[in-house]
Amino acid sequence: FPTRRSSDLGCYYWAHDIGGFRGDPNPELTVRWTQFGALSAALRVHSTKDARLDRRPWISGERETAAMRRMYHMRSELMPYVYSSVWQTHSTMVPLNRPMYIEYGGDERAYCNEQEFLFGDLLLAAPIASPGTGPDKVASQRVWFPGEDVWYDFFTHERFDGGRECEISKPLEEFPLYVRGGWVLPMQPYTPRPASTPLTTLVLRVYPSAGDA
């Protein structure tokens, strides 16, 4: 809610205290929170000054640490897209994190799922905020695929046609993240310091449109 409201009010560079400002550590929740943070204006963990509330990603369990590392790497790899999207926000005042009703306000479903948003023009995210079950900690999230576009799962490349809703289940290491078809997603190889390292290699992911697929 605060992210959506800040976008409505023109405060686009909004971040969260990943892991929680207070309260006991919850490694699974922190992983899911980090997945959301990777598609936010700023990705950071934070808490009040208390040694008992240590939020460093590498002090969680081995699996949780690996899952969070994957998200930090993904954020680094997406930096060309993030940079372009931030420049677009600066130039047009269209939010970086966009509630669905900004682009699809004519459809009532755009107002129904508070967990779903657009990150720039091409990425549709629906982060999971419920605990998982089983050894893989699988959790589900309802996702609406809007418009007449075709959407592709960022992790598996599975295709979903627009105009439908699906219940998506994901293990701890993944979350519902989709790329709009008919566009090219600019990325780069992982680098530990993406903000200060000059771009030398551009990776282009091409996603066919509905007519080309």
Predicted regions located by residue number:
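Accessory, solvent-exposed terminal regions and/or long lumenal/extracellular loops of proteins
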Residues: 172-213
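Catalytic-domain carbohydrate-binding cleft regions of carbohydrate-active enzymes
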Residues: 4-174, 179-180
